[in-house]
Amino acid sequence: MDTLTRFLPEHLQQNQLPEALGGVLLSVVSACTEINAKVRLGALAGVLGMAGTGNIQGEDQKKLDVIANNIMIDTLKANSAVAGLASEEEDTFVNAGENGRYLVLFDPLDGSSNIDVNISVGTIFSILEKPEGALATESFLQTGRQQLAAGYVLYGPQTQLVFTFGHGVYMFTLNAENEFVLTKENPKVPESTKEFAINMSNRRHWLPPVQQYIDELLAGETGTRGKNYNMRWVASMVAEIHRILMRGGVFMYPQDKRDPAKPGKLRLMYEANPMSLILEQAGASASNAYQAMLDIQPENLHQRVAVFMGSSEEVAYLDRLHAK
């Protein structure tokens, strides 16, 4: 089986991609391998619990949020091909190499509310080309279609790296020697599914199309959908999307009525865009219920969006309900 270091040069050459772009991916992987070691030790390393700080979104940070964020920043700044960074945990962008060609955006530890109870978490990342001119916030505000690469690392029973350069999706598993080994090529998400993932406790706050959709799923084979559905909810986007990649399903984090000014909870740049690129490469769909996720023009680094992604039949049906 191919290791990442053997696979990557050949993949880059086959698809006429720059070696430096592969080097940025390897820097991300190096950082994630270090984060994995911290996650694995947990309480033994004294990294669990709250950090006593908050991020720009007003969320309390876990110790591992801060540790993972610092590891990502330090590792990526050491790569001269990286011009700038943007993190869910930072107020604004971070300057890196003066002559760098690439921008890296990331959620250093997705699902960190699960850390203290030993449930799967992960790191999500996106790589963009730096536009000409001085680095500014606007440099990062590119649509998801402009991503050069996207991926995530799942820290679960196995530690797995999943990424795409826009030429298929590849999955690698970390072995005992701390090497990522290719374990699956080009997974395809089934068009139809019988699984959905949503936080049902928020049902009373959802907009009518989402309430209708969930009611139809819960009605099962005697309802309009004509089949029984199972619900899943891990509260870790990386874990949810990984399951969908492996066996299908639809993941939803809709807008709700509590704060009309907030179109959703998840971040377009750090979570929705990279996951959408991966899923589209695997034959799935992703939208905010009104347009394809990858076509949304970002307005700010920390922009939030409603998220519907997974098996294409379900995402298309949700889009139709919202269009009524």
Curated annotation (Swiss-Prot):
Its cofactor is Mg(2+). It catalyses: beta-D-fructose 1,6-bisphosphate + H2O = beta-D-fructose 6-phosphate + phosphate. GO terms for molecular function: fructose 1,6-bisphosphate 1-phosphatase activity; magnesium ion binding. Pathway: Carbohydrate biosynthesis; gluconeogenesis. It comes from the Bacteria. The keyword Ligase does not apply. Pfam families: FBPase, FBPase_C. It is an enzyme of class 3 (hydrolase). Its EC number is 3.1.3.11. Its main location: cytoplasm. HAMAP family: FBPase_class1. NCBIfam families: PRK09293.1-3, PRK09293.1-4. This is Fructose-1,6-bisphosphatase class 1. It comes from Neisseria meningitidis serogroup B (strain ATCC BAA-335 / MC58).
